[in-house]
A protein has these predicted regions:
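A short, Lys/Arg-rich alpha-helix, primarily the initiator
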Residues: 1-23
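Phosphate/dinucleotide-binding and metal-coordinating scaffold of catalytic cores
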Residues: 75-336, 340-342, 354-470
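DNA major-groove recognition helix of helix-turn-helix/homeodomain DNA-binding modules
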Residues: 55-70
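Helix-turn-helix/winged-helix DNA-binding modules
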Residues: 23, 49-52, 343
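Short basic helix-loop element that most often maps to the first helix and adjoining turn
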Residues: 15-34, 59
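Canonical protein kinase catalytic loop motif
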Residues: 347-348, 352
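Recognition helix of helix-turn-helix/homeodomain-like DNA-binding domains
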Residues: 33-51
Length: 470
């Protein structure tokens, strides 16, 4: 349905209601009193300058003794497929969305507020196909652990992007966008996950894979959270929102990811690199890393892979240079940090930037997070007999050796950060730790690795005038 056809259908409903009012001999003022609203609202609706919401349509139809089912059927045929992408309560994009058999999910853009384009999602391409791709990226991924169990509680399947959107309204803890029917009157303040409690029951399903009937659930950030491992968002009363994340399962060398998160953030802290803080907790009998949400209602996280058309390490470095020294140095420091801890999973979805939701400006590098596949998390006991040899078998996702990456990005600042790691020792958790012999072996290897990386010559200048090293 085109925007013109949609407008014509709306006008048809309004005309029928206006005719019914006149036939009843009611003035706009009298009708307004009957339904508990202002005459100005009735006037604007009949002039076509105000959308007729579902709630108001039902009240007017009842007051005029019109068949509500006929009104609903007519409205449904025109409005059920029309959605709006909003930032807070500001509509950025209006589009239709419908399943078309073998063609699959199809969108048609009706109107885009191009004057506000600086506020649009950075990874949204303003084409019909681009809208569908953006929606598909926004919902829970098919490879997420317990995805079927999560969606089954809501009567949904993993391929039902529109159905998932209808339930969760596209709400997320990454940003402040949401996707709702075009005539939806609700306010963002009443629905967002930052300020409103979300389904604890669905969080348990997301984390344990076990849950009850769909009646127990409401919308949840689980429906728009990426990643493979078991995880769940929890609202901790008086403290904030936390992500609980488990480890891999099914083999003798799995399950160590939460430990790696806990210990890796200690290394980042020692180096003086901005990092999300992790703790460890047994929740529901399952070991989890626990970290506080680092976005808020005013600030969003944008993965670098959602910004760059070409996702290569060189493209990332070039882009960060355009953002300024702070951004570029943080990226270089992260890459050296990853080389130090042998992080094998620094893909283009788990690092990026923070954005001001109100202005659309990129304001800072995001803190480092998601270090679970590091510190030899998959190493078997035999591997620790010669950890240096095992370390040489580890690699990053870029198909470039850690050492070659460091040769490109090593600067005076990174050298100063590495020097802080000399004689580093982990702080043990009060109750949840890797075996002591494993920890001491990792500490020894970190010492060797620190010396190796410090031997790499500085290829670029990072020191400004009157700025001390380290």
């Amino acid at each position: 349905m085109t925007e013109k056809e949609l407008l014509a259908a709306r006008q048809s409903i309004v005309q029928k209601l206006t005719q019914a009012r006149l036939e009843k001999g009611l003035s706009q003022e009298q009708l307004a009193k009957r339904i508990g609203t202002q005459r100005s609202n009735i006037c604007r609706i009949e002039k076509g300058t105000q959308n007729l919401s579902l709630d108001l349509m039902l009240k007017i139809a009842e007051a005029l003794d019109k068949d509500v089912s006929v009104m609903l059927e007519e409205r449904s045929s025109t409005m059920e497929k029309v959605y709006s992408l909003r930032l807070y309560d500001e509509t950025l994009l209006t589009f239709t969305l419908e399943e078309r058999g073998l063609e699959g999910l199809q969108a048609t853009i009706l109107h885009a507020e191009t004057a506000k384009q600086k506020l649009f999602p950075l990874d949204l391409e303003l084409t019909n196909e681009g809208v569908v791709k953006w929606l598909e990226r926004r919902v829970i991924p098919k490879n997420r652990q317990f995805v079927d169990e999560i969606l089954k509680t809501l009567g949904l399947s993993v391929n039902n992007t529109k159905g998932i959107m209808d339930v969760c309204m596209g709400l997320s803890l990454n940003d402040s966008y949401w996707v709702v029917p075009a005539d939806f009157d609700g306010k963002y303040a009443d629905y967002n996950f930052y300020e409103n409690r979300f389904s604890e029951a669905l969080s348990l399903v997301a984390y344990t894979g076990v849950g009850g009937s769909r009646e127990a659930f409401s919308t949840s950030p689980e429906l728009t959270t990426n990643g493979m491992l078991r995880k769940a968002w929890r609202f901790v009363e008086g403290d904030g929102i936390y992500l609980y994340k488990g480890g891999t399962e099914g083999a003798a060398n799995t399950g160590n990811e939460p430990y790696s998160e806990y210990y890796a953030c200690q290394i980042a802290d020692k180096m003086g690199i901005g990092c999300v803080q992790y703790d460890l907790e047994n929740w529901k009998g399952i070991l989890a890393s626990k970290c506080r949400l680092f976005t808020d209602i005013d600030t969003s996280f944008v993965p670098i892979g959602r910004i760059l058309r070409k996702t290569t390490l060189k493209a990332c470095l070039d882009y960060y240079k355009t953002l300024g020294d702070e951004f570029y140095e943080q990226l270089c420091s992260m890459l050296v940090f990853d080389a130090l801890i042998y992080n094998e999973d620094r893909h283009f979805g788990n690092f990026g930037l923070l954005r001001n939701n109100h202005t659309g400006e990129i304001i800072a590098p995001a803190p480092i997070f998601d270090n679970g596949l590091s510190l030899f998390n998959y190493a078997m006991p035999d591997d620790f007999k010669n950890l240096s040899a095992y370390a040489k078998t580890r690699s990053n996702p870029y198909r470039i050796s850690y050492e070659d990456v460091c040769k490109e990005v090593m600067g005076a600042k990174q050298k100063a950060q590495l020097r802080r790691m000399v004689d580093f020792k982990f702080t043990r958790h009060p109750s949840l730790n890797l075996p002591e012999e494993r920890l001491t072996a990792i500490e020894k290897q970190l010492g060797e690795r620190t010396r190796e990386l410090l031997s790499i010559p500085v290829q670029r200048s990072t020191k400004r005038k009157n700025e001390p090293e380290g």
